Amino acid sequence: MDAKIKPIRGTNPAEGRPEFQPAELEPSEFLEVAVQPDQPRPSRAEAEAAVKTLLSYIGENTEREGLIDTPRRVVEAYDELFQGYHQCPKEVLERTFGETAGYDDFVLVRNISFTSHCEHHVMPFYGKAHIAYTPVERVVGLSKLARLVDIFARRLQTQEHLTAQIAAAIDEVLKPRGVAVLLEAEHTCMSVRGIAKKGATTFTSRYTGVFRDNPAEQARFMSMVRDRG
């Protein structure tokens, strides 16, 4: 499902350089299950046949012992790798807790590992997500933020889109005073093909509310993310 986002030039006060931030997403584009149960799709047999066709395309003998079960295994792997299409981000965030004891600062969960696949080459990109939000009255279980990342990551993505979806979902469901999301990832479509530059890391960020409006909050978020102590 394609979200209607476009780059908007802004400034990252924490680093003093221009950055691009996506426009607002429509809630229907990121809060619900992406693939409905009654949505027409190819059968498993058709999917396996498609894999077999690709193997033949690269010049392989699809009848040799090592490849006989490969189409089935690939389809099963896709069921796991892209299960995010069948999961609901909104449901993950809806259970919240009110016992905050007057807590009025932001909550940060950093180093959430993730693996996704780029929508251009269907090759993995992987890295870490750092998420902060400033609650109003209620908070969400910390594991739910990691689950949210997994739901969106287990879909075909761009890193920019993934960053925007995570922030928009938290903003829409929890309605906090602000959200900050920073993703850092290595893209295998760049490290193992094309220019083949291993170790190159891509950073994307998204700020809403107090993080967008207050440069000091952005700077504090970035400082805590980078603190390895």
Swiss-Prot record:
Catalytic activity entry: GTP + H2O = 7,8-dihydroneopterin 3'-triphosphate + formate + H(+)
MF terms (GO), sorted A to Z: GTP binding; GTP cyclohydrolase I activity; zinc ion binding
Pathway note: Cofactor biosynthesis; 7,8-dihydroneopterin triphosphate biosynthesis; 7,8-dihydroneopterin triphosphate from GTP: step 1/1
Protein name: GTP cyclohydrolase 1
SUPFAM superfamilies listed in its UniProt record: Tetrahydrobiopterin biosynthesis enzymes-like
GO BP annotations, alphabetical order: one-carbon metabolic process; tetrahydrobiopterin biosynthetic process; tetrahydrofolate biosynthetic process
UniProt: Zn(2+) binding residues: 118, 121, 189
PROSITE patterns, sorted: GTP_CYCLOHYDROL_1_1
Family label: Belongs to the GTP cyclohydrolase I family.
Enzyme Commission designation: 3.5.4.16
Known partners and oligomeric status: Homomer.
Top EC class, one word: hydrolase
Residue numbers spanned by region Disordered: 1-26
Organism of provenance: Rhodopseudomonas palustris (strain TIE-1)
Pfam families in the cross-refs: GTP_cyclohydroI
Keywords: GTP-binding, Hydrolase, Metal-binding, Nucleotide-binding, One-carbon metabolism, Zinc
GO CC annotation: cytoplasm
